[in-house]
Regions:
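Alpha-helical transmembrane segments in multi-pass membrane proteins
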Residues: 40-48, 72, 80-83, 87, ...
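Generic transmembrane alpha-helix motif of multi-pass integral membrane proteins
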Residues: 23-26, 64-80, 114-118
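Aromatic-anchored segments of alpha-helical transmembrane domains
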Residues: 1-3, 45-53, 88-94, 135-144
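Alpha-helical transmembrane segments and their helix-entry boundary regions
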Residues: 68, 80-84, 100-101, 130
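Hydrophobic transmembrane alpha-helices
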Residues: 1-69
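Membrane-embedded alpha-helical hairpins and interfacial helices in multi-pass inner-membrane proteins
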Residues: 1-15, 101-102, 117-210
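Interfacial aromatic-anchored transmembrane helix boundaries in multi-pass membrane proteins
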Residues: 49-64, 85-119
Length: 210
């Protein structure tokens, strides 16, 4: 009897998620980072993780996505990815590890990475585009995590199942998107100014360009 498609996906997808992340960590290591380069990533990862734990009682409402986006904006795509990935790993040490951890590490990592990319294009000078990115990132995060549920627990995997999963999660996805928008509105300006001063003063991360 041949292997079922869902069984194959359960093996292949985690490997792919790991392979997606490895180049980011290798690229950072190849830069030969100094301790001062590690501090912003470590501190923001911990802040994001603790913020997620503090708001754990409110499903999908947390500041972690906003923190990750700010990290990417201020320190570049690579630092944004690492902050997102490590904050997911750290927060799940408090909230519980599982097969979803790799998915969250990848989703938050890419959220921070693209924030860094878009910041460099200058589009985030328009605040409405920044807040729109934050809101949509929360929605897309939820849809991405739906794939983990579908691949892990649903068979056969059909388009109907995908649509049903997205409909069922819409309340949580909206909560995530709205909370990200709110925390960006509250935190991005004051934190951005302070982080920019630190970046310029100590010449860390994005100053040396990625």
């Amino acid at each position: 009897m041949g292997l079922r498609t869902d069984s194959i996906l359960k093996v292949i997808v985690p490997v792919v998620l790991i392979l997606v992340q490895i180049p980011f960590f290798i690229a950072f290591e190849m830069k030969k980072p100094k301790p001062r380069d590690l501090m912003p990533i470590a501190v923001l990862s911990v802040i994001g993780a603790l913020g997620r734990a503090v708001f754990a009682a409110i499903p999908s409402f947390n500041p972690n996505s906003a923190v990750v986006i700010i990290a990417g904006m201020q320190f570049g795509p690579l630092a944004g990815f690492l902050t997102g990935s490590l904050s997911a790993l750290a927060s799940n040490m408090l909230l519980g590890q599982g097969p979803w951890t790799l998915w969250q590490m990848t989703a938050w990592g890419m959220m921070g990475c693209f924030a860094g990319v878009f910041q460099r294009t200058g589009i985030f000078k328009h605040r409405v585009l920044l807040y729109s990115y934050g809101f949509l990132s929360g929605i897309l995060f939820g849809w991405f995590m739906n794939l983990q549920y579908l691949i892990g627990y649903v068979y056969p995997l059909t388009m109907g199942a995908v649509i049903a999963s997205c409909v069922a999660s819409i309340t949580f996805d909206l909560a995530h998107g709205i909370s990200t928008l709110i925390f960006l509105f509250i935190l991005e300006r004051p934190w951005g100014k302070k982080l920019k001063r630190l970046k310029v003063k100590y010449g860390i991360l994005d100053i040396r360009r990625e």
